[in-house]
């Protein structure tokens, strides 16, 4: 089929590569504009753009799409059979949704209708879900409300991070998109309404990343650390210094006295243990202020933490 592909991060790049390798004719690739990144604020291309450049595909990088008559007319002129949308990062106007013969097909990182919205993978991990998956769907003007086509489910390991689940789902999403295009092409693709029992996955707020030792229990803190790894990480302050937590585990214990956030043990042999509500946080990977992330044993060899000190 003749395809216009819209996507931006590595999650989308996996799908673009799969569609390309399946032999479809990719008429154009639409991705976000290059953005400044890092200390030098150097302009960086998206993973989707990098792949498109490597394969000499036509690239569009509109700053906005809504009311962008020139861009919309150019896509109309290309006359795609279908538009594939994977983690593009912008809401598409009705004019785009109606351009192609088969409409716009989306790869969404959840088992719809659960976790509609911008951050489905992150919220599944943040909430401690034991399963998630990928859904392909026909797009409509709502927020991930279109009829579903295919689904595939996976388990979320108790220690898996958002980054690890993201990587798994990107590969599953790529495979499902190719299968979806095949079914659309031969006329066997189903249209399954989502129903009304849905949940939302809004964009993440940076304020979420500070650990609330008093109001979150140990399991919730672990899920927070998992869910925000590697996007932003979670943090707390110790003696006025910002400490980031990248991996932790939980030891269940409801009988500890003392304030939550208090250091119970800290040495390079045994590690770092912090009192939390309904349990103990065992730190596995950590990052000091203005330092690199490292395992807790290496961190404690160069940084002394006093027993009884408190994370705030």
For the regions a language model picked out, list residue spans one by one.
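One-carbon transfer enzymes
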Residues: 1-232, 241, 279-282, 288, ...
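C-terminal active-site/capping subdomain that shapes the small-molecule cofactor and substrate pocket
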Residues: 222-312
């Amino acid at each position: 089929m003749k395809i216009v592909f819209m996507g931006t991060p590595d999650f989308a790049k996996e799908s673009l590569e799969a569609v390309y390798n399946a032999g479809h004719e990719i008429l154009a690739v639409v991705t976000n504009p290059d953005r400044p990144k890092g200390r030098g604020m150097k302009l960086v291309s998206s993973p989707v753009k990098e792949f498109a450049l490597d394969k000499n595909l036509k690239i569009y990088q509109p700053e906005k799409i809504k009311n962008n008559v020139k861009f919309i007319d150019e896509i109309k002129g290309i006359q795609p059979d279908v538009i594939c949308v994977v983690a593009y990062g912008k809401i598409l106007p009705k004019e785009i949704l109606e351009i192609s013969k088969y409409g716009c097909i989306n790869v969404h990182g959840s088992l719809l209708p659960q976790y509609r919205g911008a951050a489905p993978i992150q919220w599944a991990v943040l909430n401690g879900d034991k399963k998630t998956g990928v859904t392909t769907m026909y797009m409509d003007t709502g927020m991930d409300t279109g009829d579903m086509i295919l689904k595939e489910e996976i388990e979320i390991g108790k220690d898996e991070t958002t980054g690890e689940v993201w990587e798994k789902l990107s590969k599953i999403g790529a495979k499902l998109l190719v299968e979806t295009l095949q079914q659309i092409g031969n006329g066997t693709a189903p249209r399954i309404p989502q129903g009304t029992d849905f949940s939302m996955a809004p964009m993440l707020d940076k304020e979420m990343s500070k650990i609330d030792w008093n109001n979150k229990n140990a399991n919730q803190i672990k899920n927070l650390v998992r869910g925000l790894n590697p996007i932003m990480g979670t943090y707390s302050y110790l003696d006025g210094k910002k400490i980031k937590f990248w991996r932790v585990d939980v030891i269940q214990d409801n009988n500890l006295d003392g304030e939550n956030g208090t250091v119970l043990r800290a040495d390079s042999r045994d590690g770092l243990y912090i009192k939390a509500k309904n349990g103990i946080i065992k730190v596995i990977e950590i990052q000091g202020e203005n330092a690199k992330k490292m395992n807790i044993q290496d961190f404690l060899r160069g940084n002394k933490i006093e027993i009884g000190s408190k994370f705030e």
